[in-house]
Amino acid sequence: IEAVVRAVGVPHVTVVKPYKVKKSIEAIRAAIDFEGVSVIISQETCALYAKSLKLARRKPFEVTDKCRNHRDCMDNLACPAFYVWNERIKIDPNLCTGCAVCAQICPENAILPRKEKKVTA
């Protein structure tokens, strides 16, 4: 796609990984500020599609005790892994694709990769 866009003469082409939230926002701002035609190409396998292909799975995330219930993760993302239990935000590890977007937008840095639970005999 990038080669085609450049071949037709687009002067401002940026390729981003959409799961890198800050860099994606920077690219969008640069495209808006650019005088002329600008194209942003988001290049990443869809997390749900990757899961269906059984590609290497990323570690699921969990909401830690640092969460202050601002709910930015639920209000700003359409992630099916989020749910509310006893007035606390939770992440279903079976639905979490490990994309880490929620962790990047959490104002408390309360969303972290899930720790493996050790089973004792």
Where are the regions a protein language model picked out?
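Conserved thiamine diphosphate
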Residues: 1-27
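Structural motif
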Residues: 12-14, 37-40, 88
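General beta-strand structural signal in soluble alpha/beta enzymes
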Residues: 14-17, 41-42, 113
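Glycine- and other small-residue-rich loops at beta-strand/loop junctions that grip anionic moieties
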Residues: 16-17, 65, 94
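Flexible loop/turn segments at secondary-structure boundaries
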Residues: 21-24, 47-50, 98, 113
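Glycine/aspartate-rich loop-and-adjacent alpha/beta segment that forms the canonical ThDP
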Residues: 30-84, 116-117
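Iron-sulfur cluster-binding cysteine motifs and their immediate structural context
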Residues: 68-92, 97, 101-119
